[in-house]
Amino acid sequence: MNKLIDFSKGLVPVILQHAQTDSVLMLGYMNEEAYQKTLKEKKVTFFSRSKQRLWTKGETSGHFQHVESIHLDCDQDAILIKVMPQGPTCHTGSLSCFNSEIESRFKIQALAQTIHQSAKSNQSNSYTQYLLKEGIEKISKKFGEEAFEVVIGAIKHNREEVINETADVMYHLFVLLHSLDIPFSEVEQVLAHRHQKRNNFKGERKKVQEW
């Protein structure tokens, strides 16, 4: 890919994107030397315009950006690198440098990221940490309880209750997945496969009494 990138025109903008959540993490710049170092070490290195030198992201904080894949845009003058961040990306301690929201829309992947960060935090009053410490049986029980609440709300035709309880179900599902070390991306892959697969009808299901 480096043969396709024309570094003779100056620094090339580089966008870092979380490999699992697709969150945009930061914007930096590379010269050819920084790019080659990134390829070799599999950790993102920029060319710092303020320091006027190569700068490996995380060299001071330890919050390295581990390369998962590298993509070049159609004009071959910008790079997208999907990474697994080792800690917060922003120097402020935030997960992303893009925190000044002009307009935002919640994405389900953000829930997984929030749970992941809560699990690593030292907050003694964290409900997420409490569930993870209690273990998979406790988490599974809570997930089942919340799912049953959705059923009750649906039977009562209580729209608001169904919405609220569904949110609780999603939260406990993501805690369960985290506890089992299952990234949501693997669930998405199964859904994508089923969506693309034709003639996926499996026939009539047996009634519960016949199972």
UniProtKB/Swiss-Prot annotation:
GO terms for cellular component: cytoplasm. Its main location: cytoplasm. Its EC number is 3.5.4.19, 3.6.1.31. Residues 1-107 are annotated as: Phosphoribosyl-AMP cyclohydrolase. It catalyses: 1-(5-phospho-beta-D-ribosyl)-ATP + H2O = 1-(5-phospho-beta-D-ribosyl)-5'-AMP + diphosphate + H(+); 1-(5-phospho-beta-D-ribosyl)-5'-AMP + H2O = 1-(5-phospho-beta-D-ribosyl)-5-[(5-phospho-beta-D-ribosylamino)methylideneamino]imidazole-4-carboxamide. CDD domains: NTP-PPase_HisIE_like. The keyword Nucleotide-binding applies. The keyword Cytoplasm applies. One of its GO terms (biological process) is L-histidine biosynthetic process. GO terms for molecular function: ATP binding; phosphoribosyl-AMP cyclohydrolase activity; phosphoribosyl-ATP diphosphatase activity. Residues 108-211 are annotated as: Phosphoribosyl-ATP pyrophosphohydrolase. It is found in: Cytoplasm. Pathway: Amino-acid biosynthesis; L-histidine biosynthesis; L-histidine from 5-phospho-alpha-D-ribose 1-diphosphate: step 2/9; Amino-acid biosynthesis; L-histidine biosynthesis; L-histidine from 5-phospho-alpha-D-ribose 1-diphosphate: step 3/9. Keywords: Amino-acid biosynthesis, ATP-binding, Cytoplasm, Histidine biosynthesis, Hydrolase, Multifunctional enzyme, Nucleotide-binding. Gene3D superfamilies: MazG-like, Phosphoribosyl-AMP cyclohydrolase. In the N-terminal section; belongs to the PRA-CH family. This is Histidine biosynthesis bifunctional protein HisIE. It comes from Staphylococcus epidermidis (strain ATCC 12228 / FDA PCI 1200). The gene is hisI.
